């Protein structure tokens, strides 16, 4: 199974919590004003993140179809099940055909059920790591994403699936 989703990343991401000595206020710089947003798309298998890709700004159906055809499909194996939410850009013409043309099946999650998509947990960890990196330019953000994508161990990815209720036997 491969769970597909996208998440936003911004050049103004900063840690939300921190430590300071007792009696002292924690002070940190937080960028205000102009920042750039990127969209990170990836798939989650039980053994790691696959087909990671970054887009400048938000994506639409055309960009998502290009991701499916050019990035995801080459990683698919016959018999794979691709699972994604019901975002309108995920249902554009050509997405199902491209996935099924690779010998995989496409399933959509029920509406309003992010808890059934284990990649959400991976994205939560990814965003925490990105906040710690404090990338302030698009280039630095994209490099950080590239550096962090391989940081997800197979056991950790399997636990994300297990936590979302997906079980399998070896």
State what each model feature region is.
Residues 1-170:
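Short functional hotspots at interaction and active-site rims
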């Amino acid at each position: 199974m491969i769970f597909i989703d996208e998440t936003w990343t911004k050049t103004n991401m900063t840690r939300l919590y921190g430590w300071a000595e007792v009696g002292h206020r924690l002070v940190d710089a937080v960028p205000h004003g102009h920042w750039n947003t990127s969209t990170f798309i990836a798939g989650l298998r039980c053994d790691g993140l696959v087909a990671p890709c970054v887009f400048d700004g938000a994506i639409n159906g055309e960009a998502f179809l290009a991701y499916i055809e050019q990035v995801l499909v080459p990683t698919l194996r016959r018999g794979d099940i691709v699972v994604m939410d019901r975002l309108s850009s995920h249902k554009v013409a050509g997405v199902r055909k491209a996935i099924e043309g690779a010998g995989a099946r496409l399933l959509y999650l029920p509406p309003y059920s992010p808890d059934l998509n284990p990649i959400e947990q991976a994205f939560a960890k990814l965003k925490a790591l990105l906040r710690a990196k404090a990338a302030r330019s698009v280039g630095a953000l994209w490099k950080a994403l590239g550096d962090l994508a391989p940081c997800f161990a197979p056991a950790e990815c399997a636990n994300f699936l297990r936590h979302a209720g997906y079980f399998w036997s070896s």
